[in-house]
């Protein structure tokens, strides 16, 4: 499967599967994984980028270990809503990954996610060096948590309407 919409995630998951969140950077890939109840995002160690084939192999192994059924990937839109070079790079990454996995990708608007995470880490008095180590996986968790919160809101609205 190529890409999916956020609304499709529950139907795409098999029992026991989780959802992964990715924050794609030029030097690292931030990774986070949901709990089985799709309530909480948990950061995982970042993947240091080397070259695509190695990056893909390491990422797919991590996704398999965490029994991931769907991947939510941050789409770094410009503040005005237009797609810039980073969006193109993210879409190209997904296109290149698709032949390597059957896992569906869901694009999620990640505007300001890294800024929000950096502010939170500064607020927790995390040193600059430690922030650099944690920011990409924390951003992936922020992206994934946003998607999980949206799913929760959709389920609640369906329950309230029914």
From Swiss-Prot:
Subcellular location(s) per record: Cytoplasm
Gene3D superfamilies xref list: YqgF/RNase H-like domain
Pfam family, one: RuvX
Function: Could be a nuclease involved in processing of the 5'-end of pre-16S rRNA.
Name assigned to this protein: Putative pre-16S rRNA nuclease
E.C. code: 3.1.-.-
Top-level lineage group: Bacteria
Alphabetical list of SMART domains matching this protein: YqgFc
Gene Ontology cellular component annotations, sorted alphabetically: cytosol
Keyword Signal: no
Keywords from the named record: Cytoplasm, Hydrolase, Nuclease, Ribosome biogenesis
Claim: Cytoplasm is one of the keywords in the record: yes
Entries under NCBIfam families matching the protein: RNAse_H_YqgF (TIGR00250)
UniProt GO molecular function: nuclease activity
GO biological process: rRNA 5'-end processing
Database matches in PANTHER family: POLYNUCLEOTIDYL TRANSFERASE, RIBONUCLEASE H-LIKE SUPERFAMILY PROTEIN (PTHR33317:SF4)
Entry similarity comment: Belongs to the YqgF nuclease family.
């Amino acid at each position: 499967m190529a890409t999916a919409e956020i609304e499709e995630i529950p139907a795409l998951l098999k029992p026991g599967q989780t959802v992964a969140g990715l924050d794609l950077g030029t030097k690292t890939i931030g990774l986070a994984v949901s709990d089985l109840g799709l309530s909480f995002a948990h950061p995982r160690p970042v993947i240091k980028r080397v070259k695509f084939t190695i990056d893909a192999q390491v990422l797919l192994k991590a996704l398999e270990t965490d029994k991931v059924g769907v991947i939510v990937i941050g789409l770094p839109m410009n503040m005005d809503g237009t797609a810039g070079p980073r969006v193109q790079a993210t879409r190209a990454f997904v296109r290149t990954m698709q032949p390597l996995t059957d896992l569906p990708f869901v694009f999620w608007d990640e505007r300001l996610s890294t800024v929000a995470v950096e502010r939170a880490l500064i607020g927790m008095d995390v040193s600059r060096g430690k922030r650099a180590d944690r920011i990409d996986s924390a951003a992936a968790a922020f992206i994934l948590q946003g998607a999980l919160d949206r799913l929760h809101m959709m389920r609640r609205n369906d329950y309230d309407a029914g």
